[in-house]
Amino acid sequence: MTREQVTTAEIAEVPGQDALGMQGAASDDLIELLFFAYRDFVGDPDRILAEYGFGRAHHRVLHFVVRYPGLTIAELLDILRITKQSLNRVLKDLIEQGYIEQKTGTNDRRQRLLFCTNAGADLAADLTRVQTRRVARALADRAEQTGTAATSAHDFLLAMIEPDERAAVCRLMARRARGCA
């Protein structure tokens, strides 16, 4: 069964409600809000990246390499779900401009291990800083109303990930000693 077939089969709509159990356009509103939230969440770092001639793909690579030093090319491809050709283009930019360095694996010399340089770590920190401010503001706004915004947001975002992928995401996050709690 394909992912689409499984997803369709799992959705049991209640008469008068959509697949999210909402009335009318409420689920459309939620989906639309996710689009707008994503637009603004990535828009802040996009402006910084443009100053370097970089784009979102560069940001994604920096984000994971700075958090998981020694990440292999294969691991990064698995995380980002992009083609090797796309990754090579982005890595070439980041390596040539001194933001990432690659080293040969000690156990397997065919492996290329990725590390951020100080400049790469600084750029990644700048990008994270603007995104953290946006998330912190949103959580603070919600916490005033609910008191549990961070936990709710964490659980919601984890639930948005495909069920068969959640454990892999939690394992990856555990490498930073954060985990999925």
PLM regions and their residue ranges:
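Charged, amphipathic alpha-helical coiled-coil/dimerization segments
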Residues: 4, 42, 92-158
